[in-house]
Curated annotation (Swiss-Prot):
One of the protein's GO biological processes: malate metabolic process
Keyword entries, A-Z: NAD, Oxidoreductase, Tricarboxylic acid cycle
Chain sites annotated for binding substrate: 93, 99, 132, 163
Reaction it catalyzes: (S)-malate + NAD(+) = oxaloacetate + NADH + H(+)
Residues binding NAD(+): 12-18, 106, 113, 130-132
UniProt name for this protein: Malate dehydrogenase
Family: Belongs to the LDH/MDH superfamily. MDH type 2 family.
Organism: Cupriavidus necator (strain ATCC 17699 / DSM 428 / KCTC 22496 / NCIMB 10442 / H16 / Stanier 337) (Ralstonia eutropha)
Length: 327
């Protein structure tokens, strides 16, 4: 028997990431090749015409799994009964804009969206915040939706995770698929800490294979942390297809499970590994039956603790910067 369609809300639907994302969702890449979807697309009033153009293209692909499309500039229409919500749209940083102003501009957007999700989304909605600053935007949305479970709100660290994977694959000369137990701690920003101390490639320790602390500090972490800036420098535009791909990976694994494989998700802390409760923090997780679980019992050495503290301090500062807007 055919499955009932799942409702997938996407904000910033007319944007670059949205354009890279929607066709893959409609093709079944995110929720499975047997799962029909209804896309509920949100964007600003001035972007409605552009969204209509994207929808024409979606129609022209004749995707068997696409059961319907809604276009709107009203969050309450976009999030109505949503099973999955991808919050992609965010205020980008414009020239001369202070980080504080960026935080405040986004706080307003994500407060409105959090409240709308709280009112109209499915009680089991899975929310992924892609729009930057992703961790803090996810924190704001979560705090604005007191009637939804906190664990329904997540931030995207999967792009950092995938970037780290590809760097390790290149360094070891091994395929990406052979690398396991690599993960990322903290904020989706250059302070994130990609940790390969427990990673294996074909069952062998990556740390032993590479055995190069200088490469770790001077090449690996800066390359992963500043990859977004390097792409803007090279392409003149921010990373869109890779961000969309990471969003699909994140939701697919959350919904369909990782079969014991460790991945990275930005999730609200319950105090694990000494991170203050409610902090939206990148953690190593496994997922099954639509739920994620933090990998327990990892030893945090002095070097790792120092790196985790740096990214945590940045997140605490961001959190403090928006607290007055949360009432």
């Amino acid at each position: 028997m055919a499955k009932a369609p799942m409702r997938v809300a996407v904000t910033g639907a007319a944007g670059q990431i949205g354009y890279s994302l929607l066709f893959r969702i409609a093709n079944g890449d995110m929720l499975g090749k047997d799962q029909p979807v209804i896309l509920q697309l949100l964007d600003l009033p001035q972007a409605q015409q552009a969204v209509k153009g994207v929808v024409m293209e979606l129609e022209d692909c004749a995707f068997p799994l696409l059961a319907g499309v809604v276009i709107t500039d009203d969050p309450k229409v976009a999030f109505k009964d949503a099973d999955v919500a991808l919050l992609v749209g965010a205020r980008p940083r414009s020239k001369g804009m202070e980080r504080k102003d960026l935080l405040e501009a986004n706080a307003q957007i994500f407060t409105v969206q959090g409240k709308a999700l709280d009112e109209v989304a499915s009680r089991n909605v899975k929310v992924l915040v892609v729009g930057n600053p992703a961790n803090t935007n996810a924190y704001i949305a979560m705090k604005s939706a007191p009637n939804l479970p906190r664990e329904n709100f997540t931030a995207m660290l999967r792009l950092d995770h995938n970037r780290a994977l590809s760097q390790i694959a290149a360094k070891t000369g091994k395929p990406v698929s052979s690398i396991e137990k690599l993960f990322v701690w903290g904020n989706h920003s250059p302070t994130m800490y990609a940790d390969y101390r427990y990673a294996t490639v074909d069952g062998k320790s990556v740390k032993d294979l590479i055995n190069d602390p200088v490469w770790n500090n001077d090449v690996f972490l800066p390359t992963v942390g500043k990859r977004g800036a390097a792409i803007i420098e090279a392409r003149g535009l921010s990373s869109a297809a890779s961000a969309a791909n990471a969003a699909i990976d994140h939701v697919r694994d959350w919904v369909l499970g990782t079969n014991g494989k460790v991945v990275t998700m930005g999730i609200p802390s319950n105090g694990e590994y000494g991170i203050p409760a409610d902090t939206m923090f990148g953690y190593p997780v496994t997922t099954a039956n639509g739920k994620y679980e933090i990998v327990k019992g990892l030893e945090i050495d002095a070097y790792s603790q120092e790196k985790i503290n740096i990214t945590l301090n940045e997140l605490e500062e961001e959190k403090a910067g928006v607290q007055h807007l949360l009432g």
